[in-house]
Every structure is written in C-alpha cells, then in structure tokens.
Design a protein with these regions (language model features):
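Active-site proximal beta-strand in glycosyltransferases
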Residues: 91-94, 105-136, 185
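Short beta-strand scaffold positions
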Residues: 94, 166-167
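Nucleotide-activated donor-dependent transferases that construct or modify glycoconjugates
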Residues: 1-12, 39
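Carbohydrate-associated surface elements
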Residues: 171, 190
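Phosphate- and divalent-cation-binding pockets in alpha/beta enzyme and binding domains
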Residues: 102, 174-178, 186
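Membrane-proximal helix-turn-helix segments that form the acceptor-binding/catalytic region
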Residues: 133-165, 173
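Active-site donor-binding segments of glycosyltransferases and PAPS-dependent sulfotransferases
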Residues: 25, 29-101
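Short amphipathic alpha-helix
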Residues: 15-26
Length: 191
C-alpha cells in the first residue's frame, strides 16, 4: 500500500512528486500498489500522476469542501487516517507531511515512512498558523491553541508508528529528532 496525506491539483508539489516516483518504481518492479489518501482532487492531466487509477480516500472526501480544503478538517485528520484498513498489505509506504505516517499497522507489517516534515501547524509554525487564521478575530484563539496542543500530542505519538523513518533532508531529520525524539535516515528526494 502507498499512502500520502492528500492530493490537490493546486498544491501539487515535491511531496506529491516523491509519491509519484515511489508509485512508478513499485509499479515497474513489483505490481501497482493500492493508493490511499485523506482526499483527492486532481483536476488537471498534468497532475494526474496515477493515470486515473482509483485512489482510496477517507470520509473527509465526502464532507463539504473536503476535496478542496482538507485543512478545514484539521481536528479530524488523525481520526481519518487511522480509519484506513490496511491489514491485507505486507508493506506500507507512507509519504507524510502531516498524517500519513500515523496509519495503524500490525506487528506483521513493515511500515516505512518518507517524512517531509513533522506537522508544522503543531510545532514551530503554530503561532504563524494562528496569526493567519480567523480564530483570533472571533475570540477563538484559546480553543485553537488547545486543538493544536492535542494535534502535537498525536503527531508525537504517531511519529513512532512507522518501523523505519526516512527524512527528506538533514533539516527534516533534525526536526524528527527534536519533536519526536527519533532517529531517521536521510534520502534526498529525487525531484
């Protein structure tokens, strides 16, 4: 199984390209992996990296604006990623900048996670995220801070779920060590 946080045409960047390369490599050398993502909204052919294959999505896909603005459902992302049933797979590869590394696997499965960053919203960019949200304007800064505190806890716990962590850079490896207390190997992205 291959899992990535989400696929959106308007925010198609390096993490998505890495996932595409992983898919191409696995498909060429083994068989096409089943693909999972919280949401998918690939609307143009340039970004249709999976040749119109089915992408298994979470319940967030069906919520209003879930396909196009998954961040609106930030409080539900940990729950949503944990709902994927991946029991039939021996190998799980996750490409994660928020949640994909948090999928639930069994001791009989190998989970390798290529980490682009620990959850920025919850760690060093928390105050920037708060400043750019409308929560302050509506007097909801304290509830937002509490939510981010809970997301930080989940990010810390879920960081230890993969059997093997790969960081995309020395900087990301340092962030993994600082925020999760874990070691990671570094493999620079081929993009």
């Amino acid at each position: 199984a291959l899992i990535h946080d989400w696929f959106l045409s308007e925010s198609f960047g390096g993490a998505e390209k890495v996932t595409q390369i992983l898919d191409e490599y696995i498909s060429k050398n083994f068989s096409e992996p089943d693909i999972f993502s919280l949401t998918e909204n690939i609307t143009n052919s340039r970004n249709n990296i999976f040749n119109r294959r089915k992408i298994n999505t979470s319940f967030i896909q069906k919520l209003p604006f879930g396909k196009s603005n998954v961040q609106k459902y930030l409080p539900f992302i940990p729950f949503a990623i944990e709902q994927f049933d991946l029991r039939k797979y021996d190998l799980i590869l996750s490409s994660s900048h928020i949640a994909a590394k948090g999928i639930l696997s069994s001791p009989d499965q190998l989970h390798i996670s290529y980490v682009h960053t620990p959850m920025r919203y919850a760690w060093d960019q928390m105050n920037t995220y708060i400043d750019h949200s409308n929560f302050k304007k509506y007097g909801l800064e304290i509830p937002l801070r509490y939510l981010l505190f809970k997301l930080r806890e989940w990010d810390y716990i879920s960081g230890s779920r993969p059997d093997y962590l790969i960081a995309n850079s020395k900087f990301t490896s340092r962030r993994i060590k600082k925020y999760w207390g874990l070691e990671s190997d570094i493999i620079h992205p081929p993009v």
